[in-house]
Structure formats: C-alpha cells, structure tokens
C-alpha cells in the first residue's frame, strides 16, 4: 500500500541546527528536508508534526509546510483542518483555569523543583504561553519523579522525557533534556493513534520519525519508526530502549538528513 502519513518530531529531527528547516546538524545549508517534504507531496502522503511546542508555534510550522493537521504540547492535543481534539482525559479547561493553571495551582512544579533542586527548571522562554502542559529542562530520573507524584496522590499527572536539547545548565553535567508535565493519559503515541483513526489511516501505512524516548513510543502506533542518528548519540536512555522494538530503524543521517533517509527509504520499499 502507498505511504499514507509521516509523523515527525520537529526539534532535533525534521529541523537542523538552530531549529532551521534549511540547516543540517552542523549548521550547513541543506535542502534534504524540503526534498523529503516534496516527495511526500508527490505521492499524497500527509506529514504531521508531533511536537512538544505550544499550539501557535506548531500551527505556524505546519502552515509553512502546507499541512493542515498537527500534534502539539507533547501529545496533549491534535488538530485537523481547524478542529482540535484534546487527549488529556478527565483533565480539561474549566472555571478553575487552563490545565496549565490547574497544575500550577496544585503546586506540582514547585514540588518538582524542590525535589530536584538545581537539576530541573522551566525551559525559559518556551514555557510561556502554554495551556495544557508545563515544560522544563534539566536532568532528572523520570521514574523517580513519577513515583513522587504517585506518593502525593498526584498520579493523574506524569513527567515525560522529550529528549536531549542543546540548552546547558551550569548545575547539570552533560546534556540537558526537555521534560513535560502532562495529564497521565497524554503521550505522542496516543495522539498519533488518535489522529490516524480520525483520518482513517491504517497504522501499517504510516511511519514516524523522532529523536527521544517519548518519540520512540510512537513505534507502537505506526508500521515503522525511524530514530535519527543524533538521538541515540546524545541520549543513553534512548539507546537502552531501542532493543525492545522490532519495527525501529536508526538512520545513518542526523536530524533532517535522517528524516530524508526515513522518507525516501519508505517510499522506495513501497514502489
């Protein structure tokens, strides 16, 4: 069957250095991403961004690519042709405020900052303007964080690891990671599955590309998942998680070149 859809992370995957669509991992000019997008357009395969970024950012990125659907805030919601579907379960905006405000009012971010003192902070300035999740950076044990939430009776939330980033912290050794505090039902995998159902796609006719542990879970919702080479290079946790999946390929190329490799190899297999 033809390739129906390509789900892709943005930062560190589709985008090159400096979060540019036209830069490779080293910062050189590259048309690899554009050529891959063109190839998808020629065969009628939809390209859907699955990002931790907030909705206005992802909407604009999708619009610039000519796409009408996208997944944002690490799977908290997806949009198709202007219609939004929340994936946050029982948590929803109400008279007490947005989901972001409800989580803040419960003191969960403060709890995590105190518990992981010096190892976790807001991912400024990108944590502003969010409505469904909180965005942090640092280097923490996600299982420890979620155990802490469970002990406090806040197990309707979870902390997820959205991969290594290039923003260092003076109190953290090595690469920092981006973390999202989200309702427990939220995941990129669930959002991808929800989007595919809404579009009527067979998961076997879809692929996904990413660079983080959270991205890797999307392998359960698609026929094949591609990890761009920079992902496991920068993240020991991702390297350790790879053997658990039998439908995952690590690309030779990094970032956008890896995305190009994933798209072109998938199209050639289906000729």
Language model features by range: what are they?
Residues 28-125:
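Active-site phosphate-binding/coordination module
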Residues 86-106, 160-177, 236-243:
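Charged, glycine/proline-rich intrinsically disordered loops and linkers
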Residues 2-23, 49, 219:
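Asp-based phosphoryl-transfer active-site loop
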Residues 18-39, 227-229:
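Basic, amphipathic juxtamembrane/active-site segments
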